[in-house]
Structures are given as C-alpha cells and as structure tokens.
C-alpha cells in the first residue's frame, strides 16, 4: 500500500495541543494563585476579626485575670485552713489535756472527800462513853491480869468489846487506841483541852501511857512506872545469860504484883547501899588525893 504523504504547507503540525497544555497549566496555576490569594485574604480577614475582637473585649481578659487571682487566693486558702486546723488541733489537744487534768483533779478530790467521809463515819461510830470505856478498860485489864493491853490485844479485845456500843472489829479497836494516844498527847503539847470529856480522857491516858506517853503498870488501882525494871541492870544481866531482852520484859509482865512489889523494895535497898558505898568510895578518894599532895 502506498502511504499518503503529508504536505507540510497544507497540513501543518498541530501545535495546539502543547499550547493548550500550556494554557491549561497556566490557567491551573492562576486558579491556584487565586485560591491561595483568596485563602490568604480570608485568613488575614479572620486574623483581623480575631484581633479586633480581642482588642474590643478587655472584659473577657479581666475575668481571666480575676479567675487567676481567685485561683491564687484559693490556692492560699488551703494553707490558711490548714493552719486553722492545726490551731484547732492544738486547742483541742490543750482542751483535752486540760479536761484530763481537771478530771484527775476531780477524781483526787472525790477520793479525798470519800476518805474524809469514811473517817467521819468511823469517828461517829465511837461515842464519848465508848472512848472512856476503852481507856478505863485498858487500866482495869492491866490491874487484873498484870499484862498490858498492847501485849495481849486479843484477850483485851475479847473482854472490852462487850462494853462498846457498836459491833467493833479488832482493826478498829487497835486504830482507836493508837488514835487516842496520838490525839491526847499531841494536843496536850500543842494546846490545852477545854472539854470536860477530853480532860477526863487525858487523865486516863496518863494512867496508861504516863506523863510522856510511856506505858505504866497499874497495881491495885495505883499506877506506878515499870521503867525502873527496864532501866535497871537486871534486864541487861539476865540478857547476858542468853535470854532476849524482849522475852525478859514480857516474862516480867506476867509476874504477880506482890512479887514485883517485893523485888522493887529490895532494889531500892540495893540502890541505897550503892549510894552509901559510893560515898565511902569518895571519902577514900579524897584521902588518897590529900596524901599524894602532901608527899609531893
């Protein structure tokens, strides 16, 4: 087949396609530029609007600042509240301690008051007649048995409790005896006794414990001190033989009053002879001293 030859003059090459492409490219670029320009202008307008809104609305920032200040103040408030809580805690602890101290004081006062009430109740049980009966009973018990009530408290209690107006115990009995001795001898040294009852009890107490609170022996109703035996050489001599002094004194309290009286008279005779011998010794000493003086 024969190919048809193209005439360059009649059919020139179509260059419109490249031009069209160029035009399309340029038109596309123009559109892009237009779009970009329009978008940039829109962005600028939006920024302007935002800036104008921001500039025209200072009140919107003020609340923000105020809210910030409120936030700061709120942040400070917990510190204040914490300190207040600490103070309240301190106050509460102090109040608690004060209440504990007050409660302990109240307990001590209550105990003291209850103790005083018990003492008053104990004292109110003993009447004046009971005190006189107790003291007189100690004197009579010593006269009848030759034994002190302190040495035989059980025997004395069995006898004397019948003369007390209430059901007394042995502990109350002993406490009352010690209390009467302390009362009358202590008061007598500090101040005088005005009541007739106290004066009578003091007289009985002297018969029991002596002028200075020393125990005495009652013989036939007449009181005489037993200190002469305890202070004499007899106790020491007997104790040297191997007997305890307390046993010697206790055994001596069991001796009958007639025997005690007889031994006491002999003791007085011995003491008189001792004084006579002492005077004789003094005479001999003077004579020896004079002889030595003349010799020198």
Swiss-Prot record:
Query: Which Pfam families does this chain map to?
Result: GeBP-like_C, GeBP-like_DBD
The annotated regions of Basic and acidic residues compositional bias extend over 97-119
Query: Does the record's keyword annotation contain Transcription?
Result: yes
InterPro entries registered for this protein in UniProt: GEBP, GeBP-like_C, GeBP-like_DBD
Stretches with biased composition (Acidic residues): 19-28
* Coiled-coil positions: none
**Gene Ontology molecular-function annotations:** transcription cis-regulatory region binding
Q: Does the keyword Transcription regulation apply?
A: yes
- What are the boundaries of the region Disordered? 1-119
Keyword set, alphabetical order: Transcription, Transcription regulation
* Bias-annotated ranges (Polar residues): 52-72
Name the domain of life.
Eukaryota
Provide the GO biological process annotations: positive regulation of DNA-templated transcription; regulation of DNA-templated transcription; response to cadmium ion
| Family in the record | Belongs to the GeBP family.
- For this entry, the protein name equals Probable transcription factor At1g44810
Supply the source organism for this entry: Arabidopsis thaliana
Q: What is the lineage of its organism?
A: Eukaryota, Viridiplantae, Streptophyta, Embryophyta, Tracheophyta
């Amino acid at each position: 087949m024969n190919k048809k030859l193209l005439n360059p003059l009649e059919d020139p090459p179509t260059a419109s396609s490249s031009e069209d492409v160029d035009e399309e490219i340029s038109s596309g670029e123009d559109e892009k530029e237009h779009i970009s320009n329009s978008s940039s202008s829109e962005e600028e307008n939006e920024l302007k609007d935002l800036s104008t809104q921001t500039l025209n609305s200072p009140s919107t920032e003020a609340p923000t600042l105020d809210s910030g200040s409120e936030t700061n103040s709120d942040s400070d408030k917990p510190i204040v509240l914490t300190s207040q809580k600490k103070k309240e805690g301190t106050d509460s602890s102090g109040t608690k301690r004060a209440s504990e101290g007050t409660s302990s004081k109240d307990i001590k006062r209550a105990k003291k008051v209850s103790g005083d009430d018990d003492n008053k109740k104990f004292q109110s049980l003993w009447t004046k007649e009971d005190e006189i009966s107790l003291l007189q009973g100690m004197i009579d018990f010593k006269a009848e048995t030759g034994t002190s009530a302190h040495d035989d408290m059980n025997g004395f209690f069995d006898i004397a409790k019948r003369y007390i107006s209430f059901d007394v115990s042995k502990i109350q009995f002993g406490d009352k005896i010690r209390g009467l001795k302390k009362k009358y001898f202590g008061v007598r040294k500090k101040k005088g006794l005005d009541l007739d009852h106290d004066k009578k009890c003091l007289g009985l107490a002297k018969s029991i414990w002596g002028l200075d609170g020393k125990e005495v022996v009652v013989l036939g109703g007449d009181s005489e001190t037993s200190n002469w035996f305890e202070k004499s050489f007899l106790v020491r001599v007997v104790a040297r033989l191997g007997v305890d002094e307390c046993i010697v004194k206790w055994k001596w309290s069991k001796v009958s009053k007639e025997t005690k009286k007889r031994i006491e008279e002999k003791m007085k005779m011995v003491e008189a002879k001792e004084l006579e011998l002492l005077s004789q010794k003094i005479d001999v000493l003077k004579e020896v001293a004079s002889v030595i003086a003349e010799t020198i």
